[in-house]
Amino acid sequence: MRGEKEKMLAGEWFDPHDAELTADRDRATRLMHRLNVECCGHGDDYRTTLGELCPNVRGFIREPFHCDYGYNIHMGEGSFVNFDCVFLDLAPIRIGCGTLIGPKVQLLTAHHPVSYTHL
């Protein structure tokens, strides 16, 4: 039987209250706080924190930045995300090399049942 994280990564219905997923979101929240408040958008601490939060990002993200997990965001070399973006990365988000994303952009992969029969 597949765990809830595996279901989420496969694009299937999953329980977001699962302990592993809750721990992953809590970790992302702590790293986002460090990135958005303590790192000031530059330097080794910023690059290290961004790498911990989003290990598949090869570009630059301006703060403030918000995501659910971080590990589901893939950005190519030379890509740039401007201020105040939200990436809800319950499913993979793939951004190609050299892509420029403006301020306040939201990339939302979250889904939920739209029929009471699925609840």
Segments the model singles out, each with a brief description of its role:
Residues M1-R58:
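Terminal amphipathic alpha-helical/low-complexity segments used for targeting or macromolecular assembly
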Residues V57, E63, D68-Y71, G76-E77, ...:
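Left-handed beta-helix
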